[in-house]
Structures are given as C-alpha cells and as structure tokens.
Amino acid sequence: MAATTRRLLYYVSKRFSTAGVRRSYGGLPQSNSKSPPSSSQRLMELESEFSAHNYHPVPVVFSRANGSTIWDPEGKRYIDFLAAYSAVNQGHCHPKIMKALQEQVEKLTLSSRAFYNDKFPVFAERLTNMFGYDMVLPMNTGAEGVETALKLARKWGHEKKNIPKDEAIIVSCCGCFHGRTLAIVSMSCDNDATRGFGPLLPGNLKVDFGDADSLEKIFKEKGDRIAGFLFEPIQGEAGVIIPPDGYLKAVRELCTKYNVLMIADEVQSGLARSGKMLACDWEEIRPDMVILGKALGGGVIPVSAVLADKDVMLHIKPGQHGSTFGGNPLASAVAMASLDVIVEEKLVERSASLGEELRIQLNEIKKQFPKYIKEVRGRGLFNAIEFNSESLSPVSAYDICLSLKERGVLAKPTHNTIVRLTPPLSISSDELRDGSEALHDVLELDLPNLLKINSGKTPVSHITECDRCGRNLYA
C-alpha cells in the first residue's frame, strides 16, 4: 500500500510540475535569467514596440526622482518643470506621503465599496470639512471624476429641475480639456480627440471661455434644459488660459439665476497649483460641485473626488454609480498625507511667491527675445510661454522642449506654440532660476541653429479650427 501511494505521489508531482504542465500545454514561458533592459534608448524602443502609440513623449526615461529632481538610467539629472501635469505638486516621492503608503500597504489595500474600511470615512470627513461641502463621491482618475460629475448633474437635472427625460444639457467651454473618455471628448474642440471616434454623445453645448455674455445667452435660450456648466477655472491644456477678472463671479451669478449647477474642474488647477487652494478662490466663489484629482494622490496613486452638498449628491442612489477602487484604504491614507503636506508646508503660499519669481524671470527673457515670445502668463506655479508662430516656424514648441531637455530641464508643449511650465510646488528658487537660464540659453544659442537647420522644411500643420463649432481656438 505504501509503495502504491509513493508511486501515485511521484506521478502527480511529475504530471503537475511546471515542466509537466509545459510539456502538456506548451504555454508557459521559459525562464529568462537575463537582466531587464536598463539603457534609456532600449527602454524607449521597447515601449514603442509593445505599447500603444497614444502619447508622443519627450525622449527621456525617468529612473529615479526626489522633490523636483529626476534622474535617467544613465544617471543624468534633470529639473522637473511639468510635475506629471500637476499630479506631483508636493514633489516626487515626498517622505510623508511615502510613509503613509508604506504603512497602509502592510495593513489593508482594498475592500471595495461592498464593505466599509477604516480609512475612507476619515478621509471623507477630512476632505469635505477642508473644502466646505457636505459629501464626497470618491473615484480614481480625473476623467472618472468628471464623468461622475456629469452623471450627477444630469440626475439632478431630471429629478430636481424636472428636465424632461433624456433632454438634460451640459454646457462646457471651447478649448476645454476634461479627459479623454467618450462622454468627455463629446464636449471637446480638440480634433485629435474627436475625429474617428464617433458617434459622439449628444446633450452638449459650447460657449467661449471667459465670455459671460455668451453664457447668459445660452442660458436664456435653453436654460430650462441645462443641468450644468462644466469649466476649468484656468484652462490647462489650452495653454494656461486665465479668464478675465470678474468672469467666475459672473458665472456664479448666472448659474444661480438660471438654476444651473456650476461645476468646477479643479483636477489640474486645484490643490495649491495656482497660488490658491482652489483656482476658484481667486474670485472667492463657491461652485455647486468641485472635481479634484492629480495632486490629491500626491504623485503616488490615482485619487479623484467630486464634492457637493447633499441636495445634489443624494440624487445618486446605491447601484447607480461607483468604482471598485474608489475610496480604497490605500488611496485614502495617501490622500490624507497629500493634503497634510499641502497645508503643513504652506504650498499655497510657496506657489504664489515662487510663481511671481518665475514670471519676473520669464518676462525678462521675453524682453530680450520679443521676436520669439508672444506672451508669458500664469498664476502661482501654473504658467505658460506662448511663442510667436510666425517667427518660430518651422520650429515648434516640441523642439524647444527637446532643447530644454538637453540642458537638463523637462517641460512639455501644449499645441504647437506653447510650453507649459508647472514644476512641483516644492521646487527651490535656485532650481527655478536654473530653469529660466536654460530657457534663455535655448533661445539665444539653440534656436538660431534650429531655425537654420529647419529652414527648408515645411512648417508643422496645426489645425486650430474645431470640426464641430468652427471656432479658431489657438491662432
């Protein structure tokens, strides 16, 4: 009997070993003892081969980061002037945020909203008290937060405002950027985001950003069916476009007058980026809904949130909206630490003062190169340089960013003639100065050579006319 048992065990161990399974099914990969690729060039080649081509990155590979400093695999140091589109306001790998992550990851990472966990309720209370709203609906990405706000506005419109079934309208702004999901790009004027992705979703109207008169005209004509007005207090992807003074107050008054929800997308502009906790604070207005994201996760984990009062939020019932990972304990712990850093390190004040320093430096450069620089604009550390397309062509803003990269500064273009400058709010004055000096050297030393080299090339075509509304957005 014992011999039979041993033979059976031997057969099972062989039959169901890794080698046995491989012989039977032929599906398991062979062990690879080689080290993973480490050179920047090879890593970029691998990404190009195996990843979808939905981004056009500046060719630099991040290997390590701390504060405002990035290192590539070869050890070259760079100053970060993008901060992951403002997701790293607190600085890369902030020790307090990393500690919160490490402590929580050893206890509990996910419960789903099918059950309670011991972190999200504390985070929910903290966030709502901090921003003065009754309730929060947690999600993960900024686009999810916007989608959540849109659904909530439609639901409120049908149930509270008595908009007829399936007739709720959301008004948004030309030049807006709220994400790339289907409902969101249905509002977009970005032809790259809309062409080939139809049919786009109905129920959207557009208005010029910063034009309160045009907004009131739409409200007068269709206000009985308009549920919400979605806007960025400062348009980021459009090139850090700041509305005229008084615009946000006028929007608040119009939304109240016509019973329309005022929905502020503060995913990029919020959490101290503009020199205020929220960009809406520049005009001391309170939207009906605020969407937060990016820096809410401290550059560590995706966290987004929609804030609203109960008379809006409670129109969502169980089963009508949710997310498996939204409000997870790991994200909640990280988000609370991220908020602590903003408050304790006075990042609102740092953003305001350092932003003033940066714009002084950039305007000095503008005076030296008026032929090339059309405008310097921004609030806090949310800034952009717009170049003169005629004098820059056929060189593009992307080419400027490539030259900046060679000089140790990482920035990203938006559209063909704008470079956005949004460093971590923890950046030092010396690093700001280094970044400005690098830009000066690019314009003085590199740009003349770039113009000479590219003199015979056809300028990069950048269509600025929206397919849908016909507006010339970035001319």
UniProtKB/Swiss-Prot annotation:
EC number(s) stated in the UniProt entry for this protein: 2.6.1.13
Example of a GO cellular component annotation carried by this entry: mitochondrial matrix
Reported cofactor(s): pyridoxal 5'-phosphate
UniProt modified residues of type N6-(pyridoxal phosphate)lysine: 294
Cellular compartment(s): Mitochondrion matrix
Effect of gene knockout: Unable to use arginine or ornithine as nitrogen source. Displays sensitivity against type II non-host pathogen infection.
Record's catalysed reaction(s): a 2-oxocarboxylate + L-ornithine = L-glutamate 5-semialdehyde + an L-alpha-amino acid
GO molecular function: ornithine aminotransferase activity; pyridoxal phosphate binding; zinc ion binding
Signal peptide: none
GO biological process: arginine catabolic process to glutamate; defense response to bacterium; hyperosmotic salinity response; mitochondrion localization; ornithine catabolic process; plant-type hypersensitive response; proline biosynthetic process; response to salt stress
Transit peptide boundaries: 1-16
Leading EC class: transferase
Binding site for pyridoxal 5'-phosphate: 142-143, 177, 265-268, 324
Induction behaviour: By salt stress in young plants. Up-regulated during low water potential. Induced upon non-host pathogen infection.
Ranges of Low complexity composition bias in the record: 29-41
Keyword vocabulary terms for this entry: Aminotransferase, Mitochondrion, Plant defense, Pyridoxal phosphate, Transferase, Transit peptide
Pathway info: Amino-acid biosynthesis; L-proline biosynthesis; L-glutamate 5-semialdehyde from L-ornithine: step 1/1
Region (Disordered): 23-43
Major subcellular site: mitochondrion
Annotated positions binding L-ornithine: 180, 323
Function statement: Mediates degradation of arginine for nitrogen recycling. Plays a role in non-host disease resistance by regulating pyrroline-5-carboxylate metabolism-induced hypersensitive response.
Membership in a protein family: Belongs to the class-III pyridoxal-phosphate-dependent aminotransferase family.
UniProt cross-references to NCBIfam families, sorted A to Z: Orn_aminotrans
Subunit structure: Homotetramer.
Record's protein name: Ornithine aminotransferase, mitochondrial
Organism: Arabidopsis thaliana
